[in-house]
Amino acid sequence: MAKLTVKDLDLKGKKVLVRVDFNVPLKNGVITNDNRISAALPTIKYIIEHGGRAILFSHLGRVKEEADKEGKSLAPVAKNLAEKLGQEVIFPGSTRGAELEAAIDALEDGQVLLVENTRFEDIDGKKESKNDPELGKYWASLGEGIFVNDAFGTAHRTHASNVGISANVEKAVAGFLLENEIAYIKEAVEAPERPFVAILGGSKVSDKIGVIENLLEKADKVLIGGGMTYTFYKAQGIEIGNSLCEEDKLDVAKSLLEKSNGKLILPVDSKEANAFADYTEVKVTEGEAVDAGFLGLDIGPKSIAKFDEALTGAKTVVWNGPMGVFENPDFQEGTIGVMDAIVKQPGVKSIIGGGDSAAAAINLGRADKFSWISTGGGASMELLEGKELPGLAALTEK
């Protein structure tokens, strides 16, 4: 990566501004999954072990009006982080003002301070999300010209807490997580060890058009599963019953199939049910066609075998999007089957592009078998599409 990283800096005695991604799920004030906090630890520890004073910024959820602040404070995150670091995390509970500034000025080498949810600044005119120049300048003024971006999850956004701060400091550099994310995903797509197989699931073709187009050029095979299967089926005149279908994307699906030169591989059967939730019948289709009154909710056993065969010998695999409604035990076999087919390949570099696929790997007990699980769904999608990420573009060149 031709950008400066945290290792290129002298941190001793410096107030170091750090954008992390602590956008964790909370239920009644309790963090239900703290993976993102753990993922930021190497960078935070490196800064404090080298005598820096870490000032952390993160958003949490969406905040549009005063009422949205309820349950969106980073206070539980400060507590969790303090436990992980084994030291106090100072939390003034504000995004600006005299109290925050005094707490930052009082920091000693090796201490950590967490600024309150950056999206609290969105209540008055979306200052964070619209990259308000004054806000970026103000936050940059809290440090000493050094900014570390370690939030891959927001690298595709142009916000005050990443791009805004970057524009107002002498050196904006990548943290370890951001560096690893870019290395794994970009290298997999730009310079993969072959055969390179991409697997795309999820419900909508519209979300993945750019990704499919880019990967059809780069990958040796592109396997399609999940709800978007049925838009591809209908585009070929295959009966899909009541399955999910984006009628306005049938032409796009048809054109992708035509220009894929056989690289695009679709399921050959489905697991179908007579309703999405309160179903009374679940069965496997004979072939591709879904029965009238039924909807496809997972790929079937023949498809799992077909995808297993397509993955044989793969050296690089990028997977984004589950094969079915994996949250329901009746429709998780496809996702499990594909995960197992990926991780059993000898010497494979296997990458999960965040979002639902990451949740599936974690919930179904396969996470530790993958080479890399991305922390950013939207950001990894844009990298897979071949786009430049604003948060990355704003960093200082080496």
Swiss-Prot record:
Record-annotated residues binding substrate? D21, F22, N23, R36, H59, L60, G61, R62, R119, R157
Supply the EC number(s): 2.7.2.3
* Protein keywords: ATP-binding, Cytoplasm, Glycolysis, Kinase, Nucleotide-binding, Transferase
The record's InterPro entries line, in alphabetical order, gives: Phosphoglycerate_kinase (IPR001576), Phosphoglycerate_kinase_CS (IPR015911), Phosphoglycerate_kinase_N (IPR015824), Phosphoglycerate_kinase_sf (IPR036043)
**Which Gene3D superfamilies does the UniProt record give?**
Phosphoglycerate kinase, N-terminal domain
Subcellular location(s) per record = Cytoplasm
Q: In which pathway does it act?
A: Carbohydrate degradation; glycolysis; pyruvate from D-glyceraldehyde 3-phosphate: step 2/5
Q: Which reaction does it catalyse?
A: (2R)-3-phosphoglycerate + ATP = (2R)-3-phospho-glyceroyl phosphate + ADP
A GO biological process held by the record: gluconeogenesis
Gene Ontology cellular component list: cytosol
Record-listed ATP binding positions: K208, G296, E327, G354, G355, D356, S357
Q: Does the keyword Kinase apply?
A: yes
Any one GO molecular-function label of the UniProt entry: phosphoglycerate kinase activity
Record has Protein biosynthesis as a keyword: no
Q: What class of enzyme is it?
A: transferase
Please describe the quaternary structure of this protein: Monomer.
Family of the protein in this entry: Belongs to the phosphoglycerate kinase family.
Q: What is this protein called?
A: Phosphoglycerate kinase
Record organism: Streptococcus equi subsp. zooepidemicus (strain MGCS10565)
Gene for this chain = pgk
